Amino acid sequence: MREGAPRGARLRMIDLQGAFLAPPEYDLVCVLCDSYVELAETEIAEHCAAVRPALPDAPDAETFARRFDLLTLTRKGKDHARFLYAARERGDERFLAYAPTTVRQLKRAAARASVRDARLADLAALIHELPESPCAR
């Protein structure tokens, strides 16, 4: 509770992604799998369970989990590539501090996704080999 906030007021999480049109789970991935603030897996699961029934199509738990993990792979893969590009091509290493969190999120999502769909096993194996520190190899 913030000082001066009205009694009973609760803090809320909001996501300001701009005008990007994406599946509703994408916003959850952006908020819950942020590279700058690493949430515990249990906290992520609790938020997902609370929001899932309120999504436009109210997907069943398995459909939601599949979408969430595939979107996590897409989003975190993009983040990881941007961090490495900034460091290697522009000499801007500020974002490398967030690569370990991003790689951990990629590895968890890839492992879960490959259990659901064997066609993702090779991708999961490649992601599993990513070093948390981009300078490790």
Residues of each region from the PLM?
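Pre-DFG segment of protein kinase catalytic domains
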Residues: R12-D15
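A structure-centric signal for secondary-structure junctions around beta-strands
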Residues: G8-R10, E25
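ATP/Mg2+ or Mg2+-diphosphate-binding catalytic cores
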Residues: A81-R137
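Activation-loop N-terminal segment of eukaryotic-like protein kinases
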Residues: R2-G8
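Active-site activation/catalytic loop segments of kinase-like enzymes and analogous catalytic loops
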Residues: L21-A58, L70-R90, T102-A109
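All-alpha amphipathic helical-bundle segments outside canonical DNA-binding/catalytic cores
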Residues: D60-T72, A97
